[in-house]
């Protein structure tokens, strides 16, 4: 396929390797954010793992927009590695689907800002049922952080988007922290290859 401009001409690159250089810049931003995330891990992460290991119900993951898409993957990772989990859309939760949440569940709420309205409204409703709440957001002094039992902070997450708007670095951090949680819990359960195979 040959793309042409409005005058029917094949455009030429005036800035060789510009796209590659931009991609490298964006990857560096994400890699740097992941490196900084190491410094945010402390006993709070251990508390989060313990909360999930002691959970007698399911890990109910929730998030809006791109954070919700990341939440779906985190939930799937938990489910395939020995921790019963489901994803709950926060908008639907406030229109009846909150009935999926049980007292013995842990709600894992994702929001970069910690102020996503749908997620913030869901958390106290889940707490009123008796569920525990674990949040991944930044910073902890936010409406979501103040409602949660445990907060895992994203830390500094400047987006790779040139406009500073599209979730990029923040969603990478959410996914990495979610994966780290799932893998730590997997080890805590002594989850085996045979058990993993049974789910596949």
Descriptions of predicted regions:
Residues 5, 9-12, 16-57:
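An N-terminal, well-structured beta->alpha segment
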Residues 192-200:
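Long, charged amphipathic helices and adjacent flexible linkers at domain junctions
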């Amino acid at each position: 396929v040959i793309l042409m401009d409005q005058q029917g001409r094949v455009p030429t690159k005036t800035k060789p390797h510009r796209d590659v250089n931009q991609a490298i810049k964006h990857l560096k931003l994400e890699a740097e954010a992941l490196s900084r995330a190491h410094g945010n891990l402390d006993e709070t992460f251990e508390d989060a793992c313990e909360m999930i290991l002691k959970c007698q119900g399911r890990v109910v993951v929730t998030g809006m927009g791109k954070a919700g898409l990341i939440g779906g993957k985190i939930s799937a990772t938990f489910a395939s590695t020995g921790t019963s989990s489901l994803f709950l859309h926060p908008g639907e939760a406030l229109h009846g689907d909150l009935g999926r949440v049980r007292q013995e569940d842990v709600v894992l709420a994702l929001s970069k800002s910690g102020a996503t309205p749908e997620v913030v409204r869901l958390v106290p409703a889940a707490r009123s049922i008796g569920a525990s709440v674990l949040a991944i957001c930044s910073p902890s002094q936010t409406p979501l952080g103040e409602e949660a039992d445990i907060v895992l902070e994203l830390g500094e997450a400047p987006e790779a988007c040139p406009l500073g708007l599209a979730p990029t670095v923040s969603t990478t951090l959410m996914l990495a922290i979610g994966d780290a949680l799932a893998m730590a819990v997997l080890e805590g359960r002594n989850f085996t290859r045979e058990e993993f195979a049974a789910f596949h």
